[in-house]
C-alpha cells in the first residue's frame, strides 16, 4: 500500500534521537508560522512522542504544510540528511513551496559545490619531479562510478574566512555550509608549505563525506557507527579510516602504495589524478581542465609516519582491492564494483571509492570507517557515535543508543586507538542502568516513585508495597505481578482454545444450516412452480370461458335485435292495410266494387297473435343464457371465498408452528367461511344464502348479507367436518316461482374447506 505524507512524516520523526527530538519540539514552538495557522499548545507537546507529535502536526497544519514545516525545522537544526530523505520521499512537487517557506534555510545538498578543488603544488615545489628517483609512482586513472546527478549546478562563494589549522584537521565533519569554491589567487610558498598537510586532511575528509553521500550510503542510523581515532604528534585526533600509508625514499617497501591522480578533460567529462614524489615528500595534485589556477598541497614525511596503513573513504561499503605484480614489479590495482583505488576525491558530482589493502597485513575490522552524516559544520569535530560537535548544546552528552566499537573499556589493546569509545561506553552503561531503574516501570498513582510490583486478586489491580500494607488491601490475596500475569496468560490461553473450539462447532452447524436452508429454498421453488402452473391453466380456462360467454351474449343480442325488427315490419304492414282500406272506402261505387273481395280477404287474415309472436328459439336461448350466467356467478363467488379461506391460517396452525396447543376459544373463534355449491340448473327453484357463525369475541363479518327471515324457515342443521374442528350453521331461503304446494328442494352438495367428503341428500322438511 502506498505511503502518505503522514507516514513519511512519522518515519522521519521516529528516526530522530531523543535529544534531537526535544530540540525539534523546542524549535517548533519558536518557529514563525504562516498566516492562518496557530501554534500547537505547549502542554500538548511536552510529553508528546513521535506518533503523537505527527498526529498533532497533521491535525493543526494539514499534511502538506506539516511536511514543509518539518523540512524547515530539520534544516534549521542541522538535520540535513533527514530533511533530504523526507524531501525525496514526499516528491519534488513540494520543492518550490519548501524553498518559499524555508527562506534562507536550504538543503546542504543544494549548497554543495560542483567539485572539490585541492590546491596544486607550486611550480617551483611540486610540479617537477625528481629525476634522480627512478621509482616514481605511476599515475593511474580511476574509474568513476556514475552516481545520481542530484547536486545543484550553481556554485556559491563561502562567506566565512579561511579555516584555521585546527578546524581543518577535524575529520568526518557534518558541514552545514557549502563547500569552498576555489578562485584564482596567489599564495606565498611559505604559507603553502605550512598548510599543505592540513589542507590534504581537510579535503580527504570532505571527499570521504561526499563519497558516502554519492555511493548510496546507508541511512542516518547506520551512519552513526563508531569511528576509530588515532592521535597525531600535534595532539589532534584523526579517524583511522583516513590514514594513508606513505614511505620515504629510503624506507619504501617493495610494494609501495600508489596515490593516483585524476585529470579531467577540457569538456569536463573526465577527471584524472596524478601523484608525484619529490625530495622525500608526496605531493597529491588534483587538476581540473577548466583553466583556473589551482593551489598545491604538500604532506611532510613526519605526518605520513603517524598514519596507519589503510585508507577507507566510504562509509560502510568496503571495496576489496587485489594487488598483482606486473612485469616491472610495480603494484597494480584490480577494481571491483566500479570503484578504483585512490586517495582524494576531486569532484563531488562523480563519487570515487578508495580501498587500499597492504600486501602482507590482514584487514582489521576496526579500521573500517563510517561515512559521516551531512548537515554539520565542516570545521568542527564530530563524535563518531553521538555526532556531537564542539560547541554544541549537548556538550559531552552521548545520545547514541548503542556503541558500535568492538573494544571494551579497560582493554590494553585499546590504548592509543579508540579513546572516545570509552566515554561513549560509559555513558551507554549509565543509560542502561537508568533503563533498568524503577523509574522506567509503571509507578503507583497514589504513592510516588513506588513501582507496581504486586497484584491484588480481590480488587484485580496492580499495587505497590505501600498499598499492600494499607487497610484497603489488608487480608487480600496479593501475589507478585509476574506470577499473576503468568496465571492470567494461562487463563487467556484456555479461553482462546475454548472460543476457537466453539467457533469451529458453530461454523460446522452453520454449514449444516446453510445446507438445510438451500433444501428449503429448493422445495419452496418447486411448490411455487407447482402452484403457478395450475393457476396459469385456470387463468387460461377462465379466459376461454369468458370469450365463450361473451360470444353467447352477442348472439343473444343479435337474436333480440332480429325480433324487434320483425315486430316493426309487421306493424308497418298493419299500417299500410289500414291506409289502403280507408282509401278504398272513399272511392266511388264503381271503383269500390273492383277487387273488393281480395282486399277484404287480406284484411281478415290480419290477427294480433301473428303480430306478437316471438321468433322460434329465442325464448329457449334466453332461458339457457340466464341459467348459465347465474351458475357462473355463483361458482365464481364460491371459488373466490374458498380460495381466500384456504389461504388463511387458523389459530391451530399458528400454535402448531410455535409448538403449543391452541385454546378452545381460539378454535371456536376462527370459523372459516362455509361454501355451498348448487346445481346451476335448479337455481330458479331456490336461492341459497349461507352465513358463517360469528367469531368468538368479534363482530359479525361485514362481507356477507344478513339473514333474511322467510315465511317458512326450514330446519337448522349443524354440519361437522371430519377433523371436528369447524362448526357452522346455514340458513336457507326459497323464492318459489310457482305455487306453494309444489315447493321442492333439490339435492345439493356441501363441500368443506379441507376437502372433506361431500354430504349429498340434505333434505329439509317444510313446516
Swiss-Prot record:
A zinc finger (B box-type) spans 439-481. Phosphorylation at Ser-241 is required for the interaction with 14-3-3 proteins and down-regulation of pyrin pro-inflammatory activity. Degraded along with the delivery of its substrates to autolysosomal compartments (at protein level). It comes from the Eukaryota. GO terms for cellular component: autophagosome; canonical inflammasome complex; cytoplasm; cytoplasmic vesicle; lamellipodium; microtubule; microtubule associated complex; nucleus. Expressed in spleen peripheral blood granulocytes. Not expressed in lymphocytes, thymus, testis, ovary, heart, brain, lung, liver, kidney and muscle. Keywords: Actin-binding, Cell projection, Coiled coil, Cytoplasm, Cytoplasmic vesicle, Cytoskeleton, Immunity, Inflammatory response, Innate immunity, Metal-binding, Microtubule, Nucleus, Phosphoprotein, Zinc, Zinc-finger. InterPro entries: DAPIN (IPR004020), DEATH-like_dom_sf (IPR011029), TRIM/RBCC (IPR050143), Znf_B-box (IPR000315). Homotrimer. Interacts (via the B box-type zinc finger) with PSTPIP1. Interacts (via the B30.2/SPRY domain) with several components of the inflammasome complex, including CASP1 p20 and p10 subunits, CASP5, PYCARD, NLRP1, NLRP2 and NLRP3, as well as with unprocessed IL1B; this interaction may lead to autophagic degradation of these proteins. Component of the AIM2 PANoptosome complex, a multiprotein complex that drives inflammatory cell death (PANoptosis). Interacts with NFKBIA and RELA. Interacts weakly with VASP and ACTR3. Residues 489-647 are annotated as: Required for homotrimerization and induction of pyroptosomes. The B box-type zinc finger interacts, possibly intramolecularly, with the pyrin domain; this may be an autoinhibitory mechanism released by PSTPIP1 binding. GO terms for molecular function: actin binding; zinc ion binding. GO terms for biological process: inflammatory response; negative regulation of cytokine production involved in inflammatory response; negative regulation of NLRP3 inflammasome complex assembly; pattern recognition receptor signaling pathway; positive regulation of autophagy; positive regulation of inflammatory response; positive regulation of interleukin-1 beta production; pyroptosome complex assembly. Zn(2+) binds at residues 444, 447, 467, 473. Involved in the regulation of innate immunity and the inflammatory response in response to IFNG/IFN-gamma. Organizes autophagic machinery by serving as a platform for the assembly of ULK1, Beclin 1/BECN1, ATG16L1, and ATG8 family members and recognizes specific autophagy targets, thus coordinating target recognition with assembly of the autophagic apparatus and initiation of autophagy. Acts as an autophagy receptor for the degradation of several inflammasome components, including CASP1, NLRP1 and NLRP3, hence preventing excessive IL1B- and IL18-mediated inflammation. This is Pyrin. Residues 94-219, 311-346, 697-719 are annotated as: Disordered. It comes from Mus musculus (Mouse). It is found in: Cytoplasm, Cytoskeleton; Cell projection, Ruffle; Cell projection, Lamellipodium; Cytoplasm. The modification Phosphoserine is found at residue 241. Residues 481-510 form a coiled coil. Transmembrane segments: none annotated. Pfam families: PYRIN (PF02758), zf-B_box (PF00643).
Amino acid at each position: 500500500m502506498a505511503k502518505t505524507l503522514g507516514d513519511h512524516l512519522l518515519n522521519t520523526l521516529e528516526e530522530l534521537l531523543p535529544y534531537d527530538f526535544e530540540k525539534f519540539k523546542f524549535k517548533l514552538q519558536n518557529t514563525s508560522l504562516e498566516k492562518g495557522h496557530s501554534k500547537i499548545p505547549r502542554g500538548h507537546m511536552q510529553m508528546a512522542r513521535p506518533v503523537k507529535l505527527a498526529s498533532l502536526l497533521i491535525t493543526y497544519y494539514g499534511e502538506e504544510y506539516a511536511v514543509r514545516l518539518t523540512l524547515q525545522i530539520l534544516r534549521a537544526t542541522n538535520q540535513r540528511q533527514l530533511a533530504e530523505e523526507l524531501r525525496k520521499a514526499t516528491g519534488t512537487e513540494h520543492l518550490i513551496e519548501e524553498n518559499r517557506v524555508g527562506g534562507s534555510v536550504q538543503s546542504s545538498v543544494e549548497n554543495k559545490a560542483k567539485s572539490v578543488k585541492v590546491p596544486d603544488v607550486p611550480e617551483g615545489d611540486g610540479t617537477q619531479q625528481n629525476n634522480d628517483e627512478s621509482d616514481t609512482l605511476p599515475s593511474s586513472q580511476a574509474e568513476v562510478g556514475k552516481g545520481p546527478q542530484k547536486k545543484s549546478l550553481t556554485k556559491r562563494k563561502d562567506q566565512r574566512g579561511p579555516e584555521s589549522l585546527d578546524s581543518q584537521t577535524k575529520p568526518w565533519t557534518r558541514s552545514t555550509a557549502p563547500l569552498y569554491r576555489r578562485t584564482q589567487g596567489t599564495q606565498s610558498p611559505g604559507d603553502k608549505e605550512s598548510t599543505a598537510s592540513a589542507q590534504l586532511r581537510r579535503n580527504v575528509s570532505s571527499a570521504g563525506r561526499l563519497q558516502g553521500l554519492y555511493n548510496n550510503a546507508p541511512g542516518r542510523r547506520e551512519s552513526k557507527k563508531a569511528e576509530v581515532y588515532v592521535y597525531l604528534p600535534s595532539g589532534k585526533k584523526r579517524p583511522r579510516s583516513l590514514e594513508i600509508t606513505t614511505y620515504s625514499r629510503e624506507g619504501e617497501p617493495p610494494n609501495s602504495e600508489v596515490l593516483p591522480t585524476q585529470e579531467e578533460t577540457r569538456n569536463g567529462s573526465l577527471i584524472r589524478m596524478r601523484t608525484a614524489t619529490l625530495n622525500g615528500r608526496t605531493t597529491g595534485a588534483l587538476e581540473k581542465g577548466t583553466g583556473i589556477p589551482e593551489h598545491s598541497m604538500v604532506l611532510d614525511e613526519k605526518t605520513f609516519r603517524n598514519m596507519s596503513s589503510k585508507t577507507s573513504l566510504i562509509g560502510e561499503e568496503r571495496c576489496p582491492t587485489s594487488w598483482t605484480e606486473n612485469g616491472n614489479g610495480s603494484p597494480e590495482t584490480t577494481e571491483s564494483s566500479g570503484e578504483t583505488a585512490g586517495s582524494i576525491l576531486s569532484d563531488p558530482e562523480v563519487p570515487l571509492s578508495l580501498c587500499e589493502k597492504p600486501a602482507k597485513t590482514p584487514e582489521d575490522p576496526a579500521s573500517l570507517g563510517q561515512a559521516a552524516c551531512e548537515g554539520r559544520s565542516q570545521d568542527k569535530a564530530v563524535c563518531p557515535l553521538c555526532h556531537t560537535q564542539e560547541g554544541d548544546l549537548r556538550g559531552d552528552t552521548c545520545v547514541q543508543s548503542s556503541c558500535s566499537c568492538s573494544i571494551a573499556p579497560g582493554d590494553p589493546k585499546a590504548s592509543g586507538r579508540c579513546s572516545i569509545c570509552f566515554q561513549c561506553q560509559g555513558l551507554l552503561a549509565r543509560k542502561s542502568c537508568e533503563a533498568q531503574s524503577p523509574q522506567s516501570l509503571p509507578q503507583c498513582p497514589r504513592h510516588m516513585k513506588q513501582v507496581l510490583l504486586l497484584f491484588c486478586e480481590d480488587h484485580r489491580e496492580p499495587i505497590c508495597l505501600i498499598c499492600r500494607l494499607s487497610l484497603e488491601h489488608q487480608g487480600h490475596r496479593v501475589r507478585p505481578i509476574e506470577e499473576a500475569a503468568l496465571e492470567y496468560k494461562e487463563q487467556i490461553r484456555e479461553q482462546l482454545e475454548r472460543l476457537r473450539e466453539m467457533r469451529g462447532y458453530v461454523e460446522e452447524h452453520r454449514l449444516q444450516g446453510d445446507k438445510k436452508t438451500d433444501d428449503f429454498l429448493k422445495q419452496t421453488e418447486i411448490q411455487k412452480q407447482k402452484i403457478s402452473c395450475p393457476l396459469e391453466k385456470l387463468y387460461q380456462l377462465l379466459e376461454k370461458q369468458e370469450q365463450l360467454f361473451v360470444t353467447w351474449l352477442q348472439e343473444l343480442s343479435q337474436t333480440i335485435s332480429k325480433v324487434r325488427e320483425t315486430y316493426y315490419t309487421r306493424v308497418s304492414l298493419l299500417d299500410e292495410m289500414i291506409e289502403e282500406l280507408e282509401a278504398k272506402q272513399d272511392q266511388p261505387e264503381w271503383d269500390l266494387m273492383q277487387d273488393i273481395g281480395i282486399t277484404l280477404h287480406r284484411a281478415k287474415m290480419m290477427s294480433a297473435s301473428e303480430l306478437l309472436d316471438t321468433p322460434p328459439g329465442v325464448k329457449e336461448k334466453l332461458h339457457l343464457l340466464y341459467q348459465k350466467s347465474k351458475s357462473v356467478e355463483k361458482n365464481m363467488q364460491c371459488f373466490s371465498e374458498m380460495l381466500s379461506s384456504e389461504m388463511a391460517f387458523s389459530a391451530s396452525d399458528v400454535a402448531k408452528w410455535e409448538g403449543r396447543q391452541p385454546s378452545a376459544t381460539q378454535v371456536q373463534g376462527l370459523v372459516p367461511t362455509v361454501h355451498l355449491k348448487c346445481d346451476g340448473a335448479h337455481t330458479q327453484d331456490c336461492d341459497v344464502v349461507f352465513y358463517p357463525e360469528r367469531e368468538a369475541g368479534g363482530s359479525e363479518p361485514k362481507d356477507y348479507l344478513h339473514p333474511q327471515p322467510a315465511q317458512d324457515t326450514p330446519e337448522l342443521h349443524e354440519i361437522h367436518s371430519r377433523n371436528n374442528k369447524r362448526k357452522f350453521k346455514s340458513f336457507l331461503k326459497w323464492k318459489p316461482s310457482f305455487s306453494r304446494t309444489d315447493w321442492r328442494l333439490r339435492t345439493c352438495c356441501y363441500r368443506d374447506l379441507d376437502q372433506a367428503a361431500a354430504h349429498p341428500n340434505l333434505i329439509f322438511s317444510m313446516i
